[in-house]
Curated annotation (Swiss-Prot):
The gene is deoB. This is Phosphopentomutase. Its main location: cytoplasm. It comes from Lactococcus lactis subsp. lactis (strain IL1403) (Streptococcus lactis). It is found in: Cytoplasm. One of its GO terms (biological process) is 5-phosphoribose 1-diphosphate biosynthetic process. Its EC number is 5.4.2.7. Mn(2+) 2 binds at D306, H311, H359. Keywords: Cytoplasm, Isomerase, Manganese, Metal-binding. Binds 2 manganese ions. InterPro entries: Alkaline_phosphatase_core_sf (IPR017850), DeoB (IPR010045), Metalloenzyme (IPR006124), Phosphopentomutase_DeoB_cap_sf (IPR024052). It catalyses: 2-deoxy-alpha-D-ribose 1-phosphate = 2-deoxy-D-ribose 5-phosphate; alpha-D-ribose 1-phosphate = D-ribose 5-phosphate.
Length: 411
């Protein structure tokens, strides 16, 4: 079967969920003050931002964001009379609401064993190994689930004085190392993270989903995390559609932290890490306009929605970030070829109005646009992996573990 689309561009608006998933009662956030566990059944990232702050997103509105099936309509994103794109929402079947699980399922994997988390912090023997390798002590009081901004507020001044490492975790399967760039260089931080990655792989006794380098700068009371973040992920446990495309000789482009999330597996061309989401759009545009990129697949992650606004429960900042992205959509559409396909989605929720600071278990929105499509409509609710199954069918490779293609529905 000949390709329907010469190029497919997949953009993940990290954490931009669109309402509680059917199994949200099994996933929890913890009240920051009382530590009470509250399930995610009332979470609704886009819905609550639209209601509390309001959203002025004319381009997403025209594409059909307001037409995505919901129990109640978005307050400030009205339905389009004739949406310019196919739209729907997708449900996650994997047993997790973290970045890796979401992206890996989008690329066709079914993760039924959740990645281990460490709510009590990391074991002493692991910390001792890191100390021995790095030659630096670790601040034990930080070794627990912590907000990334709060942990540097609380321990940054001490790190500036002593040079000790700040190692902390979250509700996600991550080990994060915060390092002030005046005390610990990025190069040293990355080397430490690479070591930690090497001793926490599957079968090592303590498996960790991602090791994250978190450099920051500034003075006490005014610390700021920089764009030097690096994620050191496990390699996917099975072959994803991204890897299948790569092995079939189809060009694959990574923008933002996609390459990190898949540990580079399946990525042919890495457009680099984003300084911020607007820089991420710039990098996507640079990939799309490369003369040699005539056929293939680009995969973009825009992380600021999640990292800067979702975890910090910043409704205003989150809404503004969505509007900023909406303002860039005409540029993306303008450089699309007639047979390009653009898909805009998310990987989980992170309702900035919700209790706690963790991700929320939500449906993700899906917008599917091409200049060649004649009759866009609302598609049935599907699953995350339907995206990769569609990509796979378009490029004549086998789908991964799960997912059903909707390629034939696009006319």
């Amino acid at each position: 079967m000949p390709k329907k689309f010469g190029r497919i561009h997949l953009v993940v608006m990290d954490s931009v969920g669109i309402g509680a998933a059917p199994d949200a009662d099994k996933f929890f956030n913890h009240d920051v003050e009382t530590h009470e566990a509250i399930n995610d059944v009332n979470s609704d990232t886009i819905g609550h931002i639209s209601e509390i702050r309001g959203l002025d997103v004319p381009n997403l509105q025209k594409l059909g964001w307001g037409n995505i099936p919901r129990e109640s309509p978005l307050k400030t994103v009205p339905k389009a009379d004739k949406p310019a794109a196919y739209v729907t929402k997708l449900e996650e079947i994997s047993k997790g609401k973290d970045t890796m699980t979401g992206h890996w399922e989008i690329m066709g994997l079914n993760i039924q064993t959740p990645f281990p988390t460490y709510p009590e912090g990391y074991p002493e023997d692991l910390l001792e190994k890191i100390e021995e390798f790095s030659g630096r002590k670790i601040i034990r009081e930080a070794n627990k689930p912590y907000s990334g901004t709060a942990v540097i507020e609380d321990f940054g001044p001490r790190q500036l004085e002593t040079g000790e490492l700040i190692i902390y975790t979250s509700a996600d399967p991550v080990l994060q190392i915060a390092a002030h760039e005046d005390v610990i260089s990025r190069e040293e931080l990355y080397k430490i993270c690479e070591y930690v990655r090497s001793i926490t792989l599957e079968g090592s006794g303590i498996m960790i989903g991602r090791i994250i380098a978190r450099p920051y700068v500034g003075e006490a009371g005014n610390f700021e995390r920089t764009d030097g973040r690096r994620d050191y992920a496990l390699s996917p446990f099975a072959e994803t559609v991204l890897e299948k495309l790569y092995k079939a000789g189809i060009d694959t482009y990574s923008v933002g932290k996609i390459s990190d999330i898949f540990n580079t597996v399946g990525v042919k061309y890495d457009m680099g890490h984003n300084h911020n989401d607007m820089d991420g759009v710039d990098r996507l545009l640079k990939a799309m306009t490369k003369a040699e990129f005539t056929e293939g697949f680009s995969f973009t992650n825009l992380v600021d929605f999640d990292a800067k606004y979702g975890h910090r429960r910043d409704v205003e900042g989150y809404g503004k970030a969505i509007e900023d992205f909406d303002g860039r959509l005409p540029e993306i559409i303008d450089v699309m070829k007639e047979d390009d396909l653009l898909m805009i989605t998310a990987d989980h929720g992170n309702d900035p109005s919700y209790v706690g600071t963790d991700h929320t278990r939500e449906y993700i929105p899906l917008v599917i646009f091409s200049k060649s499509l004649k009759d866009p409509k609302v598609l049935p609710v599907g699953h995350f992996a339907d995206i990769s199954a569609t990509v796979a069918e378009n490029f004549s490779v086998k789908k991964a573990q799960t997912g059903e293609s909707f390629l034939d529905a696009l006319v």
